[in-house]
């Protein structure tokens, strides 16, 4: 009887450990045998980064992706175009101890960049477009860059991520935070609109706008600029 009970306990423990291992996923350590690979990616004007990868965007005449990293890590990076969106992520249930990994995205024009997770996007040579641009973070990722010329720019954070954009030239700029993230903007705009719901901060005193509308519902703070008209609303402990 004792032997049977012990067997049941051991079997049960083995199943629990196996299940936990499956949930945790596979750990892959980079070989440090570095290679480069070019991935075909045609006809996209949006980037969606899922997970913890770090990528850089280069405005270029030809659309493609270049990946530089360990030869056993590169096959674990998934890049594909869904509609007009370039999707970038690691394979499911894989934990990457990546060491050096560079993912470079090239495209003539982008209208939206989004992060769902803890990854980072850096704009290397800015974005020049006559259309609108949208930046969105859901999680703890970061977006940074300089040299943005567009019709309308919208920045939103849901979580603890950060956005830092400089040398902005836009007719209209909107920025919103829901959470504890931070937005830092510098440049020029005709219209600016800021909204904070949470503890995050918007630093836009160096974004020279003619007309500015700012509202806070929470404990965050907003610094802003208006040369002609400022509308400010505070609901909570935050300050404008």
Language-model-derived ranges and their functions:
Residues 1-240:
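Intrinsically disordered, low-complexity terminal regions
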């Amino acid at each position: 009887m004792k032997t049977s009970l012990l067997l049941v306990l051991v079997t049960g423990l083995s199943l629990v450990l196996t299940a936990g291992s499956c949930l945790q996923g596979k750990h892959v350590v980079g070989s440090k045998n570095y290679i480069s690979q070019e991935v075909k990616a045609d006809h996209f004007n949006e980037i969606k980064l899922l997970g913890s990868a770090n990528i850089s965007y280069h405005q270029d005449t030809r659309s493609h992706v270049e990946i530089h990293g360990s030869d056993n890590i590169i096959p674990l990076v998934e890049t594909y175009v869904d509609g007009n969106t370039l999707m970038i992520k690691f394979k499911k249930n894989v934990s990457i101890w990546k060491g050096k990994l560079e993912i470079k995205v090239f495209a003539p024009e982008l209208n939206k960049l989004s992060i769902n997770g803890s990854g980072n996007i850096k704009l290397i040579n800015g974005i020049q477009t006559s259309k609108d641009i949208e930046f969105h973070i859901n999680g703890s990722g970061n977006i940074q860059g300089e040299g943005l010329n567009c019709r309308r720019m919208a920045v939103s954070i849901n979580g603890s991520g950060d956005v830092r954009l400089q040398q902005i030239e836009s007719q209209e700029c909107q920025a919103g935070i829901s959470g504890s993230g931070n937005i830092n903007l510098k440049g020029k705009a005709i219209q600016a609109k800021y909204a904070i719901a949470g503890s995050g901060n918007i630093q836009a005193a160096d974004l020279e706008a003619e007309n500015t509308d700012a509202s806070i519902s929470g404990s965050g703070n907003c610094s802003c600029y208006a040369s002609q008209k400022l509308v400010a609303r505070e609901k909570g402990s935050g300050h404008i």
